[in-house]
Amino acid sequence: MATTDPDRPISLAFVGHTTPDLADRAVAYEDAVLALLADHGARVVYRGRRRPGQDPALPLEVHLLWFPTRTAFDAYLADDRRVELLRRFGEVFTSKQVVEMDAISGVTTDIEAQ
């Protein structure tokens, strides 16, 4: 169950699918929008892209993002610069999933070790 505690850190997994004709635009959008994370105290833990030659039906990008609080995540979603990027680029993904993740007990991540 997702936490609603505004002061608790959250980690999110993002999986984005797109078509070959939108792929370059999707990458440019992600380059721009992910750069805003630091202004909200957040960071990209992992960003990966499908290898060339793989089935284009597979996700184009997968991200793991960390936010210091839910309030920071909400502020990122409402950031006027992010809204403008969405307007400028349009919908670049044909399908996307965002999953709030909990760390698995007994496994230390780089974030937890810091």
Residue spans for each PLM region:
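Short S/T/G/P-rich N-terminal loop/turn motif that feeds into the first structured element of a domain
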Residues: 1-61, 67-78, 102-114
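Conserved short beta-strand edge segments in small beta-sheet-based binding/regulatory domains
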Residues: 43, 86-102
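Generic beta-strand structural signal
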Residues: 61-63, 96-97
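Short, intrinsically disordered, mixed-charge
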Residues: 75-83, 91
